Amino acid sequence: MKRALAYIETIKELKPIQDADKIECATILGWELVVKKDEFKVGDLAVYCEIDSVLPEVPVFEFLRPKKFRIKTIKIRKQISQGIAFPLSIVKEVNPSFDIDKARIGDDLTEILGISKYELDNDIEEELQEKRSWIESYYGWLKWKIFRIKPVKTGSFPSYVPKTDETRVQKMEGLLFDKEGTACYIAEKCEGSSCTYIYRKLNGNWLSGLFGNKYCFLACSRNQIIYNSNKSSNKTHPICQIMTKYDLERKLIKLNKNIAIQGEIFGPKIQGNVYGLPEYQMRVFSIYDIDEKKYVDYESLWAITSELELNMVPVIQTNVPLINDIKYYVGLSNDKSKINSNILREGIVIRAMDSSFSFKSINPEYLLSQESKISKQQQQEEKPATFPRETVVNMSDEIRKGITLRRGLPTGGKRST
């Protein structure tokens, strides 16, 4: 199921911004964003577009062209703004067939408005997905030519294990109210790429053990199987390198439980290697019990991770009551990373001690710092190359000499008549 990026919600609150006459701060769900003054009233329905929404290139959104039509976390007059709000009439301008009279709170407008999700160019899914060494590629081609054995396709993420994803705290008002006081633990949300390692015993007759493994071990990215123990698979992917580094297949065979280890990998070429690490690392954030069809509790998570000689994500607090306060968790997310204290942490994940629910709070200051970094990189890429004047003069001399020599003349010479 795709993430809803644009939907109809009510304006919960409006408050002034210091030293600002033409703008004010609106609250939609748990999000705070800057809007034009007097454009909305409390209780109005509005079209809210989340951060990382990429709006279509249509005339009504032309003002977003300098931002490449992307909605980002920004700060205006010391007020952090996350998302953008439009009057309901905007939908009709983009999609004339839309019936405003039938609009209801919570309606997903992502497809109706033609909105897509922004993805980082260097995301591991884009940059490293299905990467193979030339030897593996040649071996696959050779098997096809000689034995007519087709190369193995990795396949989609297994349906019997939940994908690694967390909902932002700004959309969890109902849960905070219902579960207030529930014992939770809070862990750092690491910036990297999610990975899942699955061990599953295969049910079959006695012959199955003679002609193959009695188990299946899978290494997966967020959306795909990268490695399958029962097939010839790609081992050059960073997720496979982590598998080898921590000897995960052997350890999970020894553990002999139908489980999925889920974590975050980070290091060179992954999300810009924000922690400045020389090699890939993995931190475990959850373990899914395939037989019980649920995540294991905190005590079991800690015990299994220790038995497998793996590291958990940094844990900040344990056994603390859930607080019904979105702003509290947004504020708590703003701190230094425990992996590298020189950088801000991406955010936090709040999970019940029994793992019955979880959600994330992303650090707005971290998002702002990343946007600033990306903007500087783009400016450097777009900036034309310049040379000091003396370099240009020397280059001109070299070019002149080269032309003269190609004409068969001595340097600085004249053509004889």
Describe the function of each predicted region.
Residues 1-417:
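Core nucleotide-handling region used for phosphoryl-transfer chemistry
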